[in-house]
Every structure is written in structure tokens, then in C-alpha cells.
Amino acid sequence: EWYGKTKALAEEVIQNSSIDWTILRIDQPFRNDTFTKIDTLHRVLDGMKNNKLYPQFTDHHFGPTYINDLAKIIDCVIRQKMTGLYHASSGESWTDFEFAQFINQNFNLNFDLKEGSLAEYLKTSNRPYQKNTALNIDKIKLALDFELKSIKEAIKETIL
């Protein structure tokens, strides 16, 4: 897969450089407000509002990254002069269906949410698709001087 390969190559170049470096990995970022480039949360919201949301996978896991927390993480990394490779997402693991279900409930959308299967989708597509992209954030949590918001808290802060 092109994206994954180029990302891995870029990380390798950075890690083999002779300067101090920091890499922050994230997964499925979202904001609590709208932005030009649609994010994970707003893609689901828009799909529900327009009655065009595809069935959501119950067998694919991801770890959403709340942008407000990521900004604080970046600030912490700079202040503490942290170097190395860190996972900087929420540390939570959600299926696409669970994520959409919580959005549906939180915003009282009453959308008829359908379950989908990544395994079934992959039978009809040549596109590579990781079954689990959630990240373990134990390493960075040791250095943070603040508590990350839970994804549920972050979604509740979202402005429609």
C-alpha cells in the first residue's frame, strides 16, 4: 500500500539521520469543529445527516486522535524536548460501528445504522486494509503532564 510504504520510508530516513528527531504517530484524527478537510467524525456525521452512510465495519478497529489533545501533546513534546518515536492517539480502540453508534446516540440522529464486515468487503476489493490501526500510547502517557480526554468526552464537545 503506497501510503504505508511512503510513511515507513520517511520514518526510516528520519531515524537514520544524525540529528535529534521526534516522530508522533496518530490514527484517524478528528476535530470538535468543522474544517475544510473532512475528518473521521464529520464524515460519519455528514453521512448520517445526508442518509448516505455505508454499513460500518464491526471487525475493524482504530484509535481516534482528538486534535485538541494532539495539540497539547505537541506542546508537551516541545517543552520537554522529547525525542524518539511515540504513538500520540487516544489509546482507545473502537470499531467503525461503535464509533458511528456513539455519534448517532450523542447527537440524537436516529439514523438506521447498519453493521458491515471488513472481511466481507476485502473479498470484493484489492485495496489493502489493516484490521487494527489502534495504537498503544503507554510510552507517551508516561511523559504527558495532562490527562487525555476520552473519545466520548471529545465527541460530546463537538460543535454541530
Please tell me what each predicted stretch does.
Residues 22-24, 86, 149:
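Hydrophobic/aromatic beta-strand patches that form the interior of the parallel beta-sheet core
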Residues 73, 80-126:
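Mid/C-terminal beta-alpha module of Rossmann-like enzyme folds, strongest
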Residues 17-20, 50, 79-83, 109, ...:
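Short glycine/proline-enriched coil/turn segments at helix->beta-strand junctions
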Residues 31, 55-61, 86-94, 143:
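Glycine-rich Rossmann NAD(P)(H)-binding loop
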Residues 6:
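Active-site helix of classical SDR
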Residues 44, 74-78, 100-103, 155-159:
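Hydrophobic "lid"/C-terminal helical patch
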Residues 95-101, 118-158:
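Conserved C-terminal active-site "lid" loop/helix of NAD(P)H-dependent oxidoreductases
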Residues 12-62, 69:
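NAD(P)-dependent short-chain dehydrogenase/reductase
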